[in-house]
Curated annotation (Swiss-Prot):
<keyword id="KW-0456">Lyase</keyword>
<feature type="active site" description="Proton acceptor">
    <location>
        <position position="60"/>
    </location>
</feature>
<comment type="subunit">
    <text>Tetramer of two alpha and two beta chains.</text>
</comment>
<dbReference type="Pfam" id="PF00290">
    <property type="entry name" value="Trp_syntA"/>
</dbReference>
<keyword id="KW-0822">Tryptophan biosynthesis</keyword>
<keyword id="KW-0057">Aromatic amino acid biosynthesis</keyword>
<dbReference type="GO" id="GO:0005829">
    <property type="term" value="C:cytosol"/>
</dbReference>
<dbReference type="GO" id="GO:0004834">
    <property type="term" value="F:tryptophan synthase activity"/>
</dbReference>
<protein>
    <recommendedName>
        <fullName>Tryptophan synthase alpha chain</fullName>
        <ecNumber>4.2.1.20</ecNumber>
    </recommendedName>
</protein>
<feature type="active site" description="Proton acceptor">
    <location>
        <position position="49"/>
    </location>
</feature>
<dbReference type="InterPro" id="IPR002028">
    <property type="entry name" value="Trp_synthase_suA"/>
</dbReference>
<comment type="pathway">
    <text>Amino-acid biosynthesis; L-tryptophan biosynthesis; L-tryptophan from chorismate: step 5/5.</text>
</comment>
<keyword id="KW-0028">Amino-acid biosynthesis</keyword>
<comment type="similarity">
    <text>Belongs to the TrpA family.</text>
</comment>
<dbReference type="InterPro" id="IPR018204">
    <property type="entry name" value="Trp_synthase_alpha_AS"/>
</dbReference>
<dbReference type="InterPro" id="IPR011060">
    <property type="entry name" value="RibuloseP-bd_barrel"/>
</dbReference>
<comment type="function">
    <text>The alpha subunit is responsible for the aldol cleavage of indoleglycerol phosphate to indole and glyceraldehyde 3-phosphate.</text>
</comment>
């Protein structure tokens, strides 16, 4: 059984949803980034969603763009990122680990090489933010060849046809957008997502995790009450990193407290 499926089944048995934090690997530097990822898991994260630093993150607001810049300034390369992820994989063999990234980074290594490297690092899924389902064939083929789940975004404005493609092509989980626009904790997630979830279920989609604008435990609870399998929080996590750059111990404590509070909101 794959790690996402095993995790969702374990959580369902415990009457819990999943809480999944997002960080950019190597933010603010490789050494501290490893401690950050470790802290997130120890504090109760059910899976990790990770960004590979990129100089032009289109769908991201200023918070995650800042994380990309810090990581690149610290000397981050995809190889360093894969190495750090491999260390987390070795320590947490059952943890689902996903990448959220952009097509340029995949193309620059060659599509097959990229997914092969993901498989070697123990990565379970890859979501390419700027590749819609109708342009995804070569990515999906390479992902499946190397046992990596392709993840797709179900946006709130999606047609039934798009949701059907997202459901059929995706594996692992479905990234359900709570609203259109760029990422950021300032802009609140807007429910209801019930209609979207009903359609995804009708099309037999992988379990849905709600993302974009999730920054408070109450929103996690709302997402799960609406029928989502869990919630992803990115900008709110990265903001904690950003506001404690000169005090790493306080940063790790604040991250642990945030994850712990968000995770406790997943209990049904």
């Amino acid at each position: 059984m794959d790690r996402y499926q095993a995790t969702f089944e374990r959580l369902a048995a415990q009457k819990q949803g999943a809480f999944v934090p997002f960080v950019t690997v190597c933010d603010p530097n490789p050494e501290l980034s490893l401690k950050i990822m470790d802290t997130l898991v120890k504090a109760g994260a059910d899976a990790l969603e990770l960004g590979i630093p990129f100089s032009d993150p289109l769908a991201d607001g200023p918070t995650i763009q800042g994380a990309n810049i810090r990581a690149l300034d610290s000397g981050a390369t995809p190889d360093i990122c894969f190495d750090l992820i491999g260390q987390i994989r070795a320590k947490y063999p059952d943890l689902p680990i996903g990448l959220l990234m952009y097509a340029n980074l995949v193309y620059s290594r060659g599509i097959e090489n990229f997914y092969q490297r993901c498989a070697q690092a123990g990565i379970d899924s890859v979501l390419i933010a700027d590749v819609p389902t109708n342009e995804s064939a070569e990515f999906v083929a390479a992902a499946e060849k190397f046992g990596v789940h392709p993840i797709f975004i179900a946006p709130p404005t999606a047609s039934d046809e798009t949701l059907k493609q997202v459901s059929q092509l995706g594996g692992g989980y479905t990234y359900l957008l709570s609203r259109a626009g760029v990422t950021g904790a300032e802009t609140k997630a807007n429910m209801p997502v019930g209609d979207m979830l009903a359609k995804l279920e009708q099309f037999n989609a992988p379990p849905a995790l709600l993302g974009f604008g999730i920054s408070e435990p109450e929103q996690v609870k709302q997402a799960i009450d609406a029928g989502a399998a869990g919630a992803i929080s990115g900008s709110a996590v990265v903001k904690i990193i950003e506001s404690h750059l000169n005090e790493p111990d306080a940063m790790l404590t604040a991250l642990a407290n945030f994850v712990s509070n968000m995770k406790s909101a997943t209990q049904k």
